[in-house]
């Protein structure tokens, strides 16, 4: 069933996401919407009631801040643990995980399962260069039935695979 809710012309921006990027309907029928330009992920009921906001409107303090997002691009919720995995990659360079009920920060990681480094300089890269040690543009993610998290690093031209703990498994270029 297709539904519509919200009014982007008349509703306050704190209640309705602009620049949506990443949409996921979880196992409890909550609708998660990423707003990459305004650094938030918003959790709605199927009727459009806002029940949780992760991140803060227009506030980003880098890839290692536990409560703020920086350009979220994708959302996936594990139906077994209710953990919310977010690809936070337009301003930040990481995957970040929250509790889906409370919104509490749980963990985050960068490329290869290492801490993200916002100061890394990608410089001029071409297709013959080895993969960078940091994520470039974490553009999306998904979990799968094998218990792994698949992360698309668009500008890094790769997909990295992780355990849900953040431990690196493999990379496909």
How would you label these PLM feature ranges?
Residues 28, 38, 81, 90-92, ...:
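Surface-exposed loop/turn positions within WD40 beta-propeller blades
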Residues 45-49, 99-102, 163-167:
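Short loop/turn segments that connect beta-strands within beta-propeller blades
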Residues 2-7, 51-58, 105-123, 169-173:
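Beta-propeller fold detector
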């Amino acid at each position: 069933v297709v539904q519509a809710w919200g009014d982007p012309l008349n509703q306050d921006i704190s209640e309705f996401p602009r620049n949506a990027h990443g949409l996921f309907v979880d196992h409890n029928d909550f609708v998660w919407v990423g707003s990459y330009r305004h650094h938030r992920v918003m959790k709605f009921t199927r009727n459009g009631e806002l029940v949780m906001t992760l991140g803060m409107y227009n506030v980003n303090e880098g890839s290692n801040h536990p409560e703020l997002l920086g350009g979220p691009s994708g959302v996936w919720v594990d139906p077994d643990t209710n953990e919310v995995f977010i690809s936070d990659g337009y301003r930040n360079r990481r995957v970040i995980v929250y509790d889906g009920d409370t919104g509490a920060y749980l963990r985050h990681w960068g490329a290869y399962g290492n801490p993200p480094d916002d100061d890394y300089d990608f410089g001029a890269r071409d297709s013959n260069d080895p993969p960078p040690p940091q994520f470039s543009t974490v553009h999306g993610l998904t979990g799968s039935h094998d218990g792994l998290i698949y992360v698309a690093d668009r500008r890094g031209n790769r997909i990295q695979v992780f355990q849900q703990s953040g431990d690196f498994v493999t990379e496909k270029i």
